[in-house]
Regions:
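Short, cationic low-complexity segments
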Residues: 290-297
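P-loop NTPase catalytic phosphate-binding loop
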Residues: 2, 6, 12-157, 166-170, ...
Length: 300
């Protein structure tokens, strides 16, 4: 009798010990997987951000912004005060510097400025085809961009080429949420079509917004923006909406961000182009307009 008691007690102890080890092993494995998943879903800061400036007469070109200009379309997103305007102005400043005077036509801009106080300073530059801030003007500006794209597709049909062999046109839309709030139903199909056809026509759409939720940027439009600048956000969910992972909510208030394209994803210190540098650039081009008789922007 005692033998059976000891035997069953020992068997129970071994069985319990075995089950305990299996449970702990599974728990440890699960924690490891969860930790790995968290690392994958969190922005990882990378060293050696690109902050070297290529000098040209006057100011210069930031390699980070130069790369942004090579993307098909670009989304710039982050909370108020995170530096969206810094990125946007840096990209435009780089565009103004990367072209020699005799190749002005190689890049032009259509500027849509719902608040009327961010892009107006570039309105009279020879690069600017259209500047719009009133509701009717903004609609006309988008229609102008769509007409230009359609004209380029007609050329593609005639030549049989896959991509338009001509100048790049950048459609900058500041405060995209304001535009969608006031004219969403009207402009949505235009912007969606522009994004879909713009790649082959060398028409690039660059938009700024606080967070690209579906109410602000419908999925049909957002899916065209595979290149993005993610800046500081209010929450982890906002970060996921922008770059598909958390981490932007942990960034400093301004000066740092996450840049993702189909080819790379990297953490960066955002280059800062000062207001004086921007004024200097604009003044230089205004002088060129007077000296060389360049035409000011076209009307919408």
């Amino acid at each position: 009798m005692i033998f059976y008691v000891v035997f069953y007690a020992a068997a129970f102890f071994l069985f319990y010990h075995l089950i305990d080890r299996i449970v702990k092993k599974n728990k440890k494995s699960e924690q490891g997987k969860q930790g790995q998943q968290n690392r994958q879903n969190t922005v990882i800061k990378k060293s050696a951000p690109r902050t070297v400036r290529y000098t040209t007469p006057g100011n210069g070109i930031w390699p980070l912004f130069e790369d942004a200009l090579r993307q098909h379309h670009l989304l710039i997103a982050g909370k108020t005060g995170s530096g969206k305007s810094v990125v946007e102005n840096g990209i435009i400043d780089t565009l103004l510097h990367r072209l020699p005077f005799d190749k002005l036509g190689n890049a032009q801009m259509i500027l849509i400025d719902p608040k009327g106080n961010e892009l107006y300073k570039y309105a009279k530059l020879p690069h600017t085809l259209v500047y719009a801030y009133q509701p009717e003007e903004m609609l006309k500006a988008l229609q102008y961009a769509m007409d230009l794209t359609a004209e380029r597709f007609q050329v593609l049909r005639e030549t049989g080429d896959d991509y338009y062999n001509g100048s790049d046109v950048y459609v900058f839309i500041d405060e995209f949420a304001d535009l969608m709030t006031t004219q969403g139903k009207t402009v949505k199909p235009l912007i969606q079509r522009l994004c879909q056809l713009g790649r082959a026509a060398r028409v690039h759409v660059v938009i700024c917004t606080q967070t690209p939720i579906a109410k602000v940027i419908p999925t049909e439009i957002k899916c065209n923006f595979d290149s993005r600048f993610g800046l500081r956000t209010r929450s982890a969910q906002d970060s996921r909406n922008i770059i598909g992972k958390t981490g932007l909510e942990l960034l400093p208030e301004y000066g740092e961000g996450y840049y993702m394209t189909p080819k790379e994803e990297s953490y960066y210190k955002i280059p800062y182009v000062t207001k004086d540098e921007i004024r200097e650039t604009i003044a230089w081009w205004e002088d060129q307009m007077q000296q060389n008789g360049l035409n000011p922007r076209k009307a919408a």
